């Protein structure tokens, strides 16, 4: 036992320093104010189990079906727009202006798969797409297919070095509003930000610079634009993926101009006249302490500002970010990790009557504790944005509580956006579906192969195909296990050397994790390093063994357990987390879910679908006893192995509510067998009602 030192680590105790790693999803290896860094692309491979299954589905079925969609102009003009802009064929732009960025997200997903599989067919596919991007890009670095196509159709030579960057679209609100940055709803900076990230990931995965060079040109264009454009144009940007993109370009190139731009973007946001809460620019960012407005835009902004903090260490930014994070997690986030309660609303709402200050918001955060179920928007992109924000907060603080939110969102409100077979998609992720809802919501209740707003499918593709990169983080002499799953890790620690691990687990179905050292520092080094195991928020009890010897300790949720020793090949760590079924209740201020419960086991939130109620009873008539016993049961849905929960609930007397608003409380004394399935798996067995929150029937005493 002398060689084993066990610590309870409150993540704020992680040391800083430069890391050997470079080339992860976010390369904070040289970021002065980061506490940990990603492993390299390709360092982690799923081998089996839950994430092995999901990676296989997404990297094969989803990737290909999405390309088939992009490549079919009768369904989507996504790729055809690039062909027209590249001069391969003639035509007009068709589709949303943000489709360019959506294709870049798809491209980033393909590159992330290639980093693992090295499939030459994927390499060819990427080269084919990149060829069109490069041909479409203007000589000055600008690329946005609606504008490029407009210019080409007006006979403008977009490849001329003498071409001015503002030939079309220099006047906001003018007749030429289709031009560069003339209309904030053109999403140019959003598109360019995703081009930057796609170019970086492609280079890190393949070693090629074709798309990266295009991204450098685009970033240089953006720098020049912000240095020379009118204030009106410079402030005209929404959905700021470019904050993350510009900082990552700085990390990839070392160009200080890019870091300066990233800092200026925050300053410019505070100078907007007639700004909106929907776009998070009504007041300067440094005065914002609560999450507001469009949930995708806000979460992207918070992730990007965290990137800026990692490079600058500005205390005020961290004050804003930690306050906003607390507002989200303790007052505005769904139990599934989803964000964005409102389809449409006003801001502020319910706090004052000042007509001049009331604004419209959409796809937005609501008021504190405003968490409706049937009308929850919860766009998949917003939930991914929540992951991006929390992942960066993990890297800059080392605090395990951020990894917990990454896991919660990924398992529940991100995976729910795609069918189990990887072919159909949701745009929104409500927590309740009722056949009796007396109005029609904007988005369908069933997943479809193509959504007119096709931003979420490629975003989910890249996120799931990159999930292995969330499994571990590193410091110069430590490896942190953040996302459990059967995998292999091969990496190098700056102060220790090459490290290899094999992780075996049935997580999230079971809480047992086994880690075996497959490569350790050479005997001549005899240098100790630490292995940190994340203690999830839901974990109240865990046991730890090293080479079969029990290690005594008490571990608090949302921390790490540390094992520090001189490791050798063959060393084995067994980490077992108790995974009981839990009933959760909400803060009573959350009126829509008061006196209701949600079932959770491990990281998974469970739901009830109408076909899983014995006797075909209505879902609204099922109550969950406070003392219900739910038994795990292995089942299969759409070929995907799942652990369901079986138990006996109570049934309310079934009386029609037609033309009735209120009535006397009925009896709830009839037992009824129910089966709960993980929320991410709902909607895969045909049309059905569904609910996450269910009325609580308290035990009689």
Regions found by a protein language model. Name each.
Residues 1-23:
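Bacterial Sec-dependent N-terminal signal peptides
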Residues 21-102, 127-169:
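Low-complexity, Ser/Thr/Pro/Gly-enriched N-terminal "stalk/linker" regions
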Residues 23, 86-103, 119, 156-158, ...:
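Solvent-exposed loop and edge beta-strand segments that line ligand/cofactor-binding
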Residues 23, 73, 262, 321, ...:
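C-terminal beta-rich recognition modules with glycine/proline-rich loops and embedded aromatic residues
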Residues 49-53, 57, 107-120, 193-208, ...:
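Well-ordered alpha-helical scaffold segments within catalytic/enzyme domains
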Residues 86-96, 114-240, 244-276:
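Extended ligand-binding groove/face enriched in aromatic
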Residues 310-331, 371-423:
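Catalytic-core region of carbohydrate-active enzymes that cleave or remodel glycosidic bonds
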Residues 539-564, 583-589:
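Solvent-exposed beta-strand/loop surfaces of large extracellular or lumenal domains
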């Amino acid at each position: 036992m002398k060689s084993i030192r066990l610590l309870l680590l409150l993540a704020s105790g992680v040391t800083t320093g430069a890391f050997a790693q470079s080339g992860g999803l976010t390369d904070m290896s040289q970021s002065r104010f980061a506490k940990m860094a990603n492993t390299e692309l390709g360092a982690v491979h799923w081998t089996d189990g839950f994430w092995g299954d999901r990676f296989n589905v997404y990297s094969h079925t989803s990737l290909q079906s999405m390309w088939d969609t992009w490549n079919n102009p009768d369904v989507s003009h996504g790729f055809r727009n690039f062909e027209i802009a590249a001069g391969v064929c003639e035509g007009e732009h068709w589709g949303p202006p943000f489709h360019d960025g959506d294709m870049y997200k798809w491209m980033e997903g393909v590159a992330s798969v290639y980093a693992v599989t090295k499939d030459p067919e994927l390499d060819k596919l990427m080269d084919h797409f990149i060829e069109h991007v490069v041909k479409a890009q203007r000589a000055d670095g600008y690329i946005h297919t609606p504008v490029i196509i407009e210019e080409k159709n007006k006979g403008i030579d977009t490849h001329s070095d003498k071409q001015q960057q503002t030939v079309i679209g220099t006047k906001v609100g003018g007749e030429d509003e289709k031009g560069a940055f003339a209309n904030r709803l053109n999403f140019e900076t959003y598109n360019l930000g995703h081009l930057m990230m796609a170019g970086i990931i492609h280079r890190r995965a393949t070693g090629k610079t074709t798309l990266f060079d295009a991204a450098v040109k685009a970033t240089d264009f953006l720098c020049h634009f912000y240095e020379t454009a009118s204030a009106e144009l410079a402030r005209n940007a929404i959905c700021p993926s470019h904050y993350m993109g510009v900082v990552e370009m700085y990390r990839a190139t070392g160009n200080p101009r890019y870091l300066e731009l990233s800092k200026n973007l925050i300053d410019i946001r505070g100078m907007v006249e007639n700004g909106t809460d929907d776009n998070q620019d009504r007041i300067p960012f440094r005065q914002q302490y609560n999450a507001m407005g469009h949930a995708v835009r806000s979460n992207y902004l918070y992730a990007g500002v965290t990137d800026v903090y990692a490079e600058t260490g500005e205390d005020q930014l961290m004050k804003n970010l930690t306050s906003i994070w607390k507002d989200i997690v303790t007052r505005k986030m769904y139990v599934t990790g989803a964000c964005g309660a409102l389809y449409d609303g006003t801001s502020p709402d319910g706090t004052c009557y000042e007509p001049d200050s009331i604004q419209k918001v959409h796809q937005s955060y609501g008021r504190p504790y405003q968490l409706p179920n049937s009308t929850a928007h919860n766009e998949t992109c917003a939930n991914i944005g929540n992951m991006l924000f929390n992942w960066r907060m993990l890297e800059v603080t080392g605090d395990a509580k951020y990894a917990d939110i990454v896991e919660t969102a990924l398992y529940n409100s991100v995976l729910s956006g795609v069918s189990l077979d990887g072919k159909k998609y949701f745009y929104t992720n409500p927590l309740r579906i009722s056949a009796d809802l007396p109005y029609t919501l904007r988005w369908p209740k069933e997943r479809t192969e193509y959504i007119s707003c096709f931003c979420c499918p490629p975003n989910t593709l890249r996120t799931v195909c990159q999930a292995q990169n969330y499994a571990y983080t590193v410091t110069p002499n430590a490896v942190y296990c953040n996302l459990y799953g059967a995998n292999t890790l091969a990496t190098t620690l700056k102060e220790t050397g090459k490290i290899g691990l094999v992780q075996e687990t049935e997580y999230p179905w079971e809480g047992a994790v086994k880690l075996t050292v497959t490569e350790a520092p050479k005997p001549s080094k005899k240098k100790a390093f630490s292995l940190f195991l994340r203690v999830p928020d839901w974990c109240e009890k865990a046991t730890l063994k090293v080479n079969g010897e029990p290690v005594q300790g008490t571990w608090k949720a949302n921390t790490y357990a540390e094992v520090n020793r001189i490791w050798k090949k063959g060393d084995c760590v067994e980490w077992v987390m108790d995974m009981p079924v839990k009933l959760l209740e909400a803060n009573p201020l959350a009126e829509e879910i008061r006196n209701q419960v949600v079932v959770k086991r491990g990281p998974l939130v469970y739901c009830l679908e109408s076909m899983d109620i014995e006797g075909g009873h209505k879902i609204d008539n099922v109550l969950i006893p406070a003392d219900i016993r739910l038994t795990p049961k292995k089942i299969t849905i759409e070929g995907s192995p799942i652990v369901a929960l079986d138990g006996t609930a109570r049934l309310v007397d079934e009386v029609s509510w037609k033309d009735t608003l209120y009535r006397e409380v009925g009896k709830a004394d009839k037992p009824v067998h129910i089966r709960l399935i993980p929320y991410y798996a709902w909607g895969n067995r045909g049309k059905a009602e569904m609910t996450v929150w269910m009325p609580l029937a308290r035990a009689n005493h």
